[in-house]
Amino acid sequence: MMLRRSTLALAASALLATGPLALTTPAPAAAAAAATTALPHRVLFDNSKGETAGNADWIISTAQPDPRTQNANPTTEKSWTGALSAWGVALQKTGQYSLKTLPAGSTIGYGTGAALDLANFDTFVIPEPNIRFSAAEKSAIIRFVQNGGGLFLISDHDRSDRNNDGWDSPAIINDLFTNNGVNNNDPFGFSVDVKNISTDNPRAVNDAADPVLHGPFGTVTGSILRSGTTFTLKPADNPEVKGIVYRTGSSGNTGAFFVTSGYGTGRVAAWGDSSPADDGTGQSGNNLFNGWDDPAGTNAALALNATAWLSKG
């Protein structure tokens, strides 16, 4: 993706360098050419790791892999079925994103040639995984980021094992960081705290230049925490790590609720609770709550700005 965009940029530079000859090109034709070569940000949401186990419904749509087969022109979160549908619909409505879901029973791969291989996407969203990644999958995820991909991780609280297989999201994510076969020393510079924090309204740091806090979808002032956890930063392992939203009374390397980092040529974001992304809609039988629009936080802006940043938009 980066290569193709760079190619377009070089072509544009060559056009400008032709001087007066460039004036002979009709402006409408140039605009039409630019429109046809615009490339959408490709985002893959994971559903291969028990994201709908128990009372969870962390999908953008039940139509998988392509949510547009449920509704090609969604207007609200109810256009698609899933507790993350508001997130997906907001991206879809911009016309700048191409969304897919990795269905249950699938394997996460990188460089396999499969249609849903990570190499075909700019950003991979893993919302509260409940099944441990295999050794090959952990390697694939790390290499994806290392080579320019964006990874969005959402954890939940300690003992949030929804499918009773002995693994919850904090343990699964920490295992990814320390047992991936590529870099086993916290490659992204943070770890998930093994905690169950009942409630808080974490606040954003004061950083006018941060692209996630001040992005294309609005300004982030804070988030909500409703049975979740936090992260410990380890800048000695990766100096690019940064906490941008913190639990009340916390700062520095402890108590970070939303974290960003870089690794290789890729980017990473992590959120300490699934509640802020929950839009309160989804499949029947799930007890869901609308954290997406909770006035105690600016959760929609946080999720969407982070997605844009990870996709290098």
Question: What residue ranges belong to the model's regions?
Answer:
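C-terminal region of N-terminal signal peptides and the immediate post-cleavage residues
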Residues: 17-36
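Short, surface-exposed patches at the edges or C-terminal ends of soluble domains, predominantly
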Residues: 34-313
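Bacterial N-terminal signal peptides that target proteins for export
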Residues: 1-11
